[in-house]
Amino acid sequence: MQGARTGSHSYSILQGKSKRCYFTDTETGPLERHHIYFGAGMRQISDKHGFWVWLKPEWHRGTSGVHGRDGHKVDLRLKQDCQRRFEETHSREEFMAIIGRSYLGDEPEGKPQMPADTGGFYLL
């Protein structure tokens, strides 16, 4: 997938071109663009690779939002979701070369493998 501008994604790798709050799936009311990896030049990297999402203001800047004092869990969830999506088509080493670290710990990289034939059932 390539964005409209060379070397930059005009869409989010998590949401595509949809303009809806990532957490509430609503498109009404104001939405703010959140760069998933931010600070020290990371906003430009997030723009370049599509590492951003649309959020309602309370999910962005509210107390429990990604930038709020109680928002660590939702911030980490976004970072992990983004890394998982990136690793569907790229390696963990590529992600770490771009971002500088992994947010997935010991979680295996890449797409989940389909199980062997289970007689029509998908076992979780």
Regions from the PLM with identified roles:
Residues 1-29, 47-53, 61-124:
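Extended charged
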Residues 29-43:
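Short recognition patches in nucleic-acid-associated and regulatory proteins
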